[in-house]
A protein has these predicted regions:
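Well-ordered alpha-helical segments embedded in enzymatic catalytic cores
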Residues: 71-74, 97-101
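Surface-exposed, flexible loop/turn segments at secondary-structure boundaries
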Residues: 34, 54, 94, 121, ...
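Acidic-and-aromatic substrate-binding clefts and catalytic sites of carbohydrate-active enzymes
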Residues: 91-97
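Beta-rich, aromatic/charged-enriched effector core domains that present basic-aromatic interfaces
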Residues: 10, 98-171
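N-terminal beta-strand-loop-alpha-helix module at the start
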Residues: 9-91
Length: 171
């Protein structure tokens, strides 16, 4: 069975921090690096993941990969200097894959994951699928990358529209 192998991965990947009798963590991907974030103030472990989507899915330019890694390492240092507990999952670690990561989190006893809206359909589907399989609750927070909030766009992109035009949205 793989569960014995999984235990070894889990121990090296995450530490347990209990918050309100719930084991919670903040999951941060390479496109979600923010200096000011409400996630940093909740007292949870921050897990920075060099996810396969951003590092392995395609043959990315080496400078792009170096930039992602340097940015993530910089955020790790920044958070540690603020006294926030951080775990860093390298793209070389098996847990950089959504399935393995969520299995590891479940095996370690985590039940609640805070993260930003992934803004990537593939990553969103993977996270939704694996969270259901592993029994993890994901709490999505508004992504600061965007001016509009998701609920603000519901009126415009409702089911009543048959066609979408750039001019109608921006003018």
């Amino acid at each position: 069975r793989r569960s014995g192998m999984m235990s070894n991965i889990v121990v090296s990947v995450v530490d347990v921090i209990k918050t309100d009798n719930m084991q919670s963590l903040n999951l941060i991907f390479p496109n979600q690096l923010f200096e000011d974030s409400p996630l940093y103030s909740n007292g949870n472990l921050c897990v920075l993941v060099e996810h396969d989507l951003f590092f392995k899915q395609f043959k990315f330019h080496k400078q792009k990969l170096a930039f992602h890694r340097a940015s993530m390492q910089s955020l790790k240092t920044f958070l540690e200097e603020k006294g926030i507990k951080v775990r860093y999952i390298s793209s070389l670690d098996k847990a950089s894959n959504t399935q393995v990561l969520f299995q590891a989190l479940n095996a370690e006893g985590f039940v609640h994951v805070n993260t930003y809206l992934p803004v990537d359909n593939w990553l969103d589907k993977q996270m939704t699928k694996e969270s259901k399989i592993q029994g993890l609750e994901i709490e999505y927070h508004e992504n600061p990358l965007f001016l509009n909030k998701e609920e603000d766009l519901q009126d415009f992109f409702g089911k009543s529209k048959n066609r979408y035009f750039h001019n109608d949205f921006y003018i």
